[in-house]
């Protein structure tokens, strides 16, 4: 299951060169593009299966297999929004994490950076207004670097203070679903749906006017 995604995770950071300009690496680049596209297609299939279980949420497009600089970007993501949500609202998303030998998909409450408005960060900070539930964790951005923070009441208070002081720019709430070789797609979708329901209160809190 999701074999192309797993294989493509090992290509993180690899530079893609158009095959016609790649000289002796032409075939290698053709294979790289084919793998990237196949991995993205698997992510699209998964995202669509998940969308069918999350009505009224609608999926956005899955991220590209390479960025504008043509660097491979295998940690695909896909955002989900309710019909009433604006583009600058806080949304729900799934995102790949890990390496080929140990990986999974996280569900998160976050927003699209390039679509944010003056109010988006303040909305995102409201995820800290609710107590953190077991099995969830925070992902905090400090000085441009994001790092995992264990989901405890003590850390919630610490992050609230850090946000107030301007030391932490944004805090996501996340839930990890490890992917195993023996798992089937239906089981994975079920676990991701469960993650969505665990995180939904934080999404609702963030978008409350």
Please give the residue ranges for each predicted region.
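Short, internal acidic amphipathic alpha-helical interface segments
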Residues: 110-169
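Short N-terminal edge-element motif at the start of the domain
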Residues: 44-74
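Aromatic- and glycine-enriched beta-alpha-beta binding-site module
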Residues: 68-131
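Long, solvent-exposed, polar/charged low-complexity segments
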Residues: 1-54, 149-209
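Short, surface-exposed, charge-dense and proline/glycine-enriched linear segments
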Residues: 60, 82-97, 136-142, 168-173
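Generic structural hydrophobic/aromatic packing signal, biased to beta-strands
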Residues: 78-80, 105-109, 138-139, 171-175, ...
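Residue-level detector of functional hotspots within protein domains
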Residues: 62-64, 80, 157-159
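Acidic-enriched, low-complexity/disordered segments with a strong bias for Aspartate over Glutamate
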Residues: 31, 60, 85-89, 118, ...
């Amino acid at each position: 299951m999701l074999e192309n995604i797993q294989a493509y995770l090992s290509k993180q950071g690899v530079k893609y060169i158009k095959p016609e300009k790649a000289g002796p690496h032409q075939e290698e680049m053709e294979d790289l593009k084919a793998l990237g596209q196949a991995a993205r297609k698997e992510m699209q299939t998964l995202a669509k299966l998940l969308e069918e279980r999350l009505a009224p949420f609608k999926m956005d497009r899955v991220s590209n297999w390479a960025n504008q600089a043509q660097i491979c970007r295998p940690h695909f993501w896909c955002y989900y929004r309710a019909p009433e949500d604006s583009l600058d609202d806080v949304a729900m998303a799934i995102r790949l994490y890990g390496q080929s030998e140990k990986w999974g998909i996280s569900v998160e409450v976050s927003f699209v950076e390039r679509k944010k408005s003056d109010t988006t960060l303040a909305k995102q900070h409201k995820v800290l207004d609710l107590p953190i539930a077991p099995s969830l964790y925070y992902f905090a951005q400090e000085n441009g670097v994001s790092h995992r923070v264990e989901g405890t009441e003590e850390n919630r208070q610490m992050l609230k203070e850090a946000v107030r002081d301007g030391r932490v720019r944004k805090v996501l709430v996340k839930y990890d679903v490890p992917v195993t070789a023996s798992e089937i797609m239906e089981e994975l979708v079920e676990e991701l749906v469960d993650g969505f329901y665990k995180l939904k209160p934080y999404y609702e809190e963030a978008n409350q006017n």
